[in-house]
Swiss-Prot record:
Pathway: Amino-acid biosynthesis; L-threonine biosynthesis; L-threonine from L-aspartate: step 4/5. NCBIfam families: PRK01212.1-4, thrB. It comes from Sulfolobus acidocaldarius (strain ATCC 33909 / DSM 639 / JCM 8929 / NBRC 15157 / NCIMB 11770). GO terms for cellular component: cytoplasm. This is Homoserine kinase. It catalyses: L-homoserine + ATP = O-phospho-L-homoserine + ADP + H(+). GO terms for molecular function: ATP binding; homoserine kinase activity. HAMAP family: Homoser_kinase. It is found in: Cytoplasm. Pfam families: GHMP_kinases_C (PF08544), GHMP_kinases_N (PF00288). Catalyzes the ATP-dependent phosphorylation of L-homoserine to L-homoserine phosphate. The keyword Kinase applies. The keyword ATP-binding applies.
């Protein structure tokens, strides 16, 4: 069986660990087979991915799920990475989702989407040390999602009534353990005023998407807490956001923990100028970037049954 899952951008401004959006910039694939066995055994291979079960988000998610269900089977999987790792594009989450969706279909486990998210988010422990649900929720459901609770996992799709695409400014680099380090940068305490303003931003983002109001979405794509705390990871961000809005982008935000920047554009935006001036800004920070245009995408799917 071959299963695929799309890349994603989480947070979307003030929606830390709440909002995420699946997009078709990249996709991860997992080839999988299940063989009857007297014990549970999970084997994982793939170019450039850990082959230790507890260090690979895909294999760890599957192992924990089948252990919990007391399923005795030998699962062999090959992870084919299409999503760049460590750049804020939901790479580890997509692999975990593809693997969990695969084993759910192969073994006819009957998991619904909420349960798929819960199982997949466990895989994030292998890559970042914490079971955060936002990226995996986007890769399971597709579209834009809101994580409403984690115990129990509760996810709600957000209706999108605005036609836009993303320009992803993706630094060409490799960052080891980036998500874990980025989480360590977060403040332990937050000033009340900043919390209130962030709540307003989050409300504006959701309302802008649902109502199809680009000005509300522009207002919402801001964050005074998480993006500020992590700003050393993406020094090019503020200037890139500024020139994007000057060229009539809807707005911009850090994609997940960065350093990728997501610029929201539509028919009123000067995409060519945003690309040109954005790349120039990246270069002023000695940062080579590539620009990838992407649209909102669907959830994980089975590409092929063997």
């Amino acid at each position: 069986m071959l299963i695929k899952a799309y890349s994603s951008s989480a947070n979307l401004g003030a929606g830390f660990d709440i909002l995420a959006l699946a997009h078709n910039a990249f996709e991860d694939s997992v080839e999988m087979e299940a063989i009857p066995n007297s014990t549970l055994q999970v084997l994982v291979t793939g170019d450039g991915v850990p082959n230790e079960v507890d260090k690979n988000s895909a294999s760890y998610a599957v192992y924990r799920l089948l252990s919990e269900l007391d399923v005795k089977v030998k699962v062999k999987m090959k992870v084919i990475k299409g999503i760049p790792a460590g750049l804020g594009l939901g790479s580890s989450g997509a692999s975990a989702v593809a693997a969990v969706v695969g084993v759910n279909n192969l073994l006819k486990l009957g998991l619904d989407k909420q349960e798929l998210v819960r199982a997949s988010m466990i895989g994030e422990i292998a890559s970042s040390g914490s079971a955060h649900p936002d990226n995996v929720a986007a890769s399971v459901y597709g579209g834009v999602v809101a994580v409403l609770n984690t115990e129990p996992v509760t996810v709600s799709p957000i209706p999108v009534n605005l036609n836009f695409s993303l320009l992803l400014f993706i630094p060409v680099l490799q960052l080891k353990d980036k998500t874990k380090k980025a989480r360590e940068m977060l403040p332990r305490n937050v000033e009340l005023g900043k919390m209130v303003r962030n709540s307003r931003y989050l409300s504006s983002t959701i309302l802008g998407l649902v109502k199809g109001d680009r000005e509300l979405l522009r207002l919402g794509l801001n964050d005074e807490i998480v993006e500020v705390a992590r700003s050393p990871l993406f020094p090019h961000y503020e200037k890139l956001k500024k020139i994007s809005i000057e060229n009539n982008a809807i707005g911009a935000c850090v994609s997940g923990a960065g350093p990728t920047i997501a610029v929201f554009v539509d028919e009123y935006s000067d995409k060519n100028k945003i690309k040109k001036e954005g790349l120039e800004i990246c270069e002023t920070y000695s940062q080579k970037c590539l620009v990838k245009e992407a649209k909102i995408a669907g959830g994980a799917w089975v590409e092929r049954w063997n």
